[in-house]
């Protein structure tokens, strides 16, 4: 398999969590969420290149946390941008061509090795891969014009890690000047470089953005 990288995006402020510190630094089973996330990729492959994207003001705090919790997993910390788009773009400057690169949310600490492995293996052939899960709740479209039920079988919840041949993702980010993207598959699709492939995600691969999410993660974590 090609050389592997993961860009872990963790520069958010976590306003929905209503906590005094950003959500990626909140404790989960006695240590910061972000450490669990990094450990998940290190367990998958101890040789993976881990690139951590933080805001400038968070880098010093992260360094102090690593010292406090004796966190020794090797990773490269870089400064994020004003939006997620520019944070990932900054991370890509540290990624070589002709490699495989994953982009993962820093607050998805419960990602399993099986999902990571499946995404990387599929990306070798499909070039751009994303995990997703079907919607099980009823779904409605509510706008100024419509208030109607829609067919939930046509919609999926998209997760990370999203994995790419590095050339594909680098070229997609270089080809667009818009930063109105919520994930990296959307950036690749906008450039019409390739057609992304969906793989089966996991319900336990939750994104921790609210206090309820944190409680669920506490119950699910090994």
From Swiss-Prot:
Pathways per UniProt: Isoprenoid biosynthesis; isopentenyl diphosphate biosynthesis via DXP pathway; isopentenyl diphosphate from 1-deoxy-D-xylulose 5-phosphate: step 2/6
Molecular function via GO: 2-C-methyl-D-erythritol 4-phosphate cytidylyltransferase activity
One Gene Ontology biological process: isopentenyl diphosphate biosynthetic process, methylerythritol 4-phosphate pathway
Pfam families (UniProt xref): IspD
InterPro entries: IspD, IspD/TarI, IspD/TarI_cytidylyltransf_bact, Nucleotide-diphossugar_trans
EC assignment: 2.7.7.60
Residues carrying the site annotation Positions MEP for the nucleophilic attack: 152, 207
Family in the record: Belongs to the IspD/TarI cytidylyltransferase family. IspD subfamily.
Protein name: 2-C-methyl-D-erythritol 4-phosphate cytidylyltransferase
